[in-house]
Regions:
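Short, cationic-aromatic polyanion-contact patches
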Residues: 4-11, 56-68
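Short acidic, hydrophobic short linear motifs in intrinsically disordered regions
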Residues: 23-33
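Glycine-centered, phosphate/nucleic-acid-interacting loop/turn motifs that mediate DNA/RNA or nucleotide
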Residues: 52
Length: 68
């Protein structure tokens, strides 16, 4: 599979996890999606953020993400 496909697939996993779980920490998203590489997860965040679908919040040094 090419990289763009992988990012798109992972973006779908992230969207589904956040749709079910609401606002989650990055650690919780990683666990829920089973995306192994952190870079792949952040690429998926970028995909969704570019589409205007994610909000980010820094809470006491920990990054949280949610669907908008």
């Amino acid at each position: 599979r090419n990289m763009i496909e992988l990012i798109g697939t992972n973006a779908g996993l992230v969207w589904n996890a956040l749709n079910e779980g609401g606002k989650m920490s990055v650690k919780a998203v990683k666990k829920a999606t089973k995306i192994k590489a952190e870079k792949d997860m952040y690429a998926a965040f970028g995909w969704l953020a570019k589409e205007g679908k994610l909000a980010f919040e820094n809470v006491e040094g920990e990054l949280y993400v949610a669907l908008v």
